[in-house]
A protein has these predicted regions:
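Gly/Ser-rich oxyanion-binding loop with an adjacent helix/lid
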Residues: 1-34
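Glycine-rich, charge-dense phosphate/pyrophosphate-binding loop(s)
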Residues: 81-166
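Short, acidic Gly/Pro/Ser/Thr-rich loop/turn segments
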Residues: 36-37, 54-59, 135
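Short beta-strand segments
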Residues: 22-23, 49-53, 120, 153
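A generic structural signal for well-ordered coil/turn residues at beta-strand boundaries
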Residues: 15-16, 23-24, 43-46, 122-123
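C-terminal domain-closing interface element
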Residues: 25-53
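Acyltransferase
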Residues: 44-102, 108-112
Length: 166
């Protein structure tokens, strides 16, 4: 699973957080180093996602620079553990923008309307969360940028098979 993906160089973390969020829905907190799910809970919000035209592979991420922001990322994790998902997302996003030398402008611009915004994973995409009206405003601003903008609702149900069973 995660260890094999890390060894193959296709992921930095093992992607347990991504896999469990996709499978279970809602917000998940994981310890990727231990391949452990810590908590999963429902989270109802609207989401805007900005996908720039540029592409970036997570395997090309500067791991050493990412380690330098580990204390900030730990603080963001503590915020998430306390249920403060918007601030956790924003703090984590800015930390990784700095570590990965990515322009944080899309997140900064989104914060004019959204509750939280940040880099998605190692980028280059950004996500913002908030109520329907604020996410419409974020999407309007992001549509001025080169790339694609999606507006979505969080999925609290997780994956289901074609037959509808879970």
């Amino acid at each position: 699973g995660g260890e094999a993906a890390r060894e193959a160089g296709v992921t930095i973390t093992g992607a347990l957080d991504d896999a469990t969020a996709s499978m279970l829905g809602g917000v998940v907190l994981t310890d990727n180093s231990k391949d452990e799910l810590i908590r999963r809970e429902s989270f109802d919000t609207r989401v805007a996602v900005y996908v720039p035209d540029e592409r970036a592979a997570s395997a090309s991420t500067n791991v050493e620079r990412s380690k330098l922001v580990a204390p900030v990322v730990e603080r963001a994790f503590d915020m998430a553990r306390d249920g403060d998902y918007a601030d956790a997302m924003t703090t984590n996003g800015f930390a990784y923008c700095a570590a990965l030398r990515r322009d944080a402008s899309p997140a900064v611009d989104a914060l004019a309307h959204a509750e939280g915004a940040g880099l998605s994973g190692t980028g280059p995409s950004f996500a913002a969360i908030g109520d329907s009206g604020s996410i419409k405003e974020v999407a309007k601003d992001w549509k001025k940028l080169d790339g694609k903008v999606l507006t979505l609702e969080t999925d609290n149900r997780g994956v289901s098979t074609n037959s509808g069973t879970r």
